[in-house]
């Protein structure tokens, strides 16, 4: 009889003890400061058109670790170099996965890519393969002839405009340059005079960027948001965009099968070879969809970030004539009278590298990086960050933090003189490519494109504002979206440097 009562009492005692321990644990947990929100939507109304700017303003009141509720999703934003270090280095393994987002899920064939895939064995093996085969320093040097060819075409175009003293849309030209390099390196096909140089291709790329950076209700209300996306037409637009990109990839595969491509071995060749070798990634063999997902990363990542950085750099240089004169003098003195800059010359252009670092500080291409998802609970500054929390790092705000940078709104490349700070992910004051396990694997490729492109622009030409325009007329507005590009295009007049 005693045994009958003993077992239920033991069970209830265990439940009570567990409840008390849970209550005590919760009492010791500290949530980060949080701005007040509304029922259902939480803090969504506070995001604004440019979330990185809105969140930076909020962090000035609520601190560098801030908890918000975006719909039903708990979200933490870190906005200082110290808190970024804690998240991306000290606790990197706790928060190096990715959240489930509708646009990335569709474009990546259900997370078969490098950027948006959750953290697992498949992602680790895919990243290792891509770093070794696609983004290694060896591969970056192998495609240097492609960069040189595309830059030469651009310089010839500017020479024609200079002879006629006509303005050029530099934003558009730099975007075409990066598209040309990426398409030749990835697909073995020139941009000009091919299927790529069409309104349809431009629309495919534009729509893909739009879906990656626009508001999707299902990202914030997972259970019912898909209904809103369906009613607004977003779901249908997304599906059409994915079908269009899929058809484009298939067209590129057909060109390779038929041998109708140009030049040396490209990214598609390398990936198709790995598919033929039945390369195993995590839970299965490399398939055509895996290749398409990786090509999406190469295409969208390569086209967006390099052109954005070069455009912002030229914008800042036009607003700062002293810096423009200094960087051009360095380049022209170092290069001498050569008709073309080579990759080895770039290593000697120290002030140019400072100009680029300063551009990344003020204008990181992805101002909030790509969001992370917390896998296991950890603490930042004594605040508990639970599992399943979405995590953003506001690198745009970190670059403007007066506790880190003197005169943070001033464009001053000299701040990097005798400084060990660089953009390689170990200095948390400057994180244009992120840090930790989810750092951009194509950092070296992107940096090389920016350095080589800018060096040629500044070596071959002097740049003037269109007639009737003064420095004060240059606007600095950013466009909304995942990438913070210049909202209004930069239009300048090239003038041939006569001493060449």
Swiss-Prot record:
Predominant location: membrane
Entry membrane topology: Single-pass membrane protein
GO CC annotation, single: membrane
Subcellular location, record wording: Membrane
Pfam families listed in its UniProt record: p450
Enzyme Commission identifier(s): 1.14.-.-
InterPro entries per record: Cyt_P450, Cyt_P450_CS, Cyt_P450_E_grp-I, Cyt_P450_sf
Cofactor: heme
Protein's UniProt keywords contain Membrane: yes
Coiled-coil stretches noted in the UniProt entry, renumbered to this chain: none
Transmembrane segments: 2-22
CDD domains: CYP71-like
Positions contributing to heme binding: 440
Keywords tagged on the record: Heme, Iron, Membrane, Metal-binding, Monooxygenase, Oxidoreductase, Transmembrane, Transmembrane helix
Single GO term (MF): heme binding
Record family assignment: Belongs to the cytochrome P450 family.
PANTHER family for this protein: CYTOCHROME P450 71A9-LIKE ISOFORM X1, CYTOCHROME P450 FAMILY 71 PROTEIN
Stated name of the protein: Cytochrome P450 71B37
The species this protein was found in: Arabidopsis thaliana
Lineage of the organism: Eukaryota, Viridiplantae, Streptophyta, Embryophyta, Tracheophyta
Chain's gene name: CYP71B37
């Amino acid at each position: 009889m005693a045994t009958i009562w003993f077992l239920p009492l033991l069970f209830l005692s265990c439940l009570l003890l567990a409840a008390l321990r849970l209550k005590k644990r919760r009492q010791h947990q500290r949530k980060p400061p949080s701005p007040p929100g509304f029922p259902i939507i939480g803090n969504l109304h506070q995001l604004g058109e440019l979330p990185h700017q809105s969140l930076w303003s909020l962090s000035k009141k609520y601190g560098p670790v801030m908890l918000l509720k975006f719909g039903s999703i708990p979200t933490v934003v870190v906005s200082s170099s110290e808190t970024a270090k804690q998240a991306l280095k000290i606790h990197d393994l706790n928060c190096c996965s990715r959240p489930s987002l509708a646009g990335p899920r569709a474009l990546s064939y259900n997370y078969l890519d490098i950027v948006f895939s959750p953290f697992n064995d498949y992602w680790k093996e895919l990243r290792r393969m891509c770093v070794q085969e696609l983004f290694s320093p060896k591969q970056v040097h192998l495609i240097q002839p492609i960069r040189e060819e595309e830059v030469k075409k651009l310089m010839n175009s500017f020479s024609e405009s200079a002879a006629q003293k006509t303005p050029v849309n530099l934003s558009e030209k730099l975007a075409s340059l990066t598209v040309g390099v990426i398409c030749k390196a990835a697909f073995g096909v020139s941009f000009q005079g091919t299927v790529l140089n069409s309104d349809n291709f431009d629309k495919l790329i534009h729509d893909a960027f739009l879906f990656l950076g626009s508001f999707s209700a299902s990202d914030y209300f997972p259970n019912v948001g898909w209904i809103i996306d369906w009613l607004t037409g977003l779901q249908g637009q997304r599906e059409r965009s994915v079908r269009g990109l899929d058809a484009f990839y298939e067209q590129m595969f057909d060109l390779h099968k038929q041998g109708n491509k140009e030049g040396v071995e490209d990214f598609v060749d390398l990936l198709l070879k790995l598919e033929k070798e039945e390369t195993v990634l995590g839970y299965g063999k490399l398939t055509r969809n895996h290749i398409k997902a990786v090509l999406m990363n190469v295409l969208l990542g390569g086209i967006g970030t390099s052109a954005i950085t070069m455009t912002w750099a030229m914008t800042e240089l036009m607003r700062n004539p002293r810096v423009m004169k200094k960087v051009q003098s360095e380049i022209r003195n170092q290069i001498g009278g050569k008709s073309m800059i080579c990759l080895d010359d770039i290593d000697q252009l120290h002030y140019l590298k400072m100009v680029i670092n300063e551009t990344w500080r003020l204008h990181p291409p992805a101002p909030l990086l790509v969001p992370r998802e917390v896998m296991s609970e950890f603490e930042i500054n004594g605040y508990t960050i639970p599992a399943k929390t979405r995590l953003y790092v506001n690198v745009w705000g970190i670059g403007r933090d007066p506790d880190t940078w003197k005169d943070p709104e001033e464009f001053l490349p000299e701040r990097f003189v005798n400084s060990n700070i660089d953009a390689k992910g170990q200095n948390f004051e400057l994180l244009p490519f992120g840090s930790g396990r989810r750092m951009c694997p194509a950092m070296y490729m992107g940096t090389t494109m920016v350095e080589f492109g800018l060096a040629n622009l500044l070596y071959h030409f002097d740049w003037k504002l269109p007639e009737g325009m003064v420095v004060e007329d240059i606007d600095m507005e950013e466009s909304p979206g995942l990438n913070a590009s210049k909202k209004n295009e930069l239009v300048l007049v090239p003038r041939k440097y006569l001493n060449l």
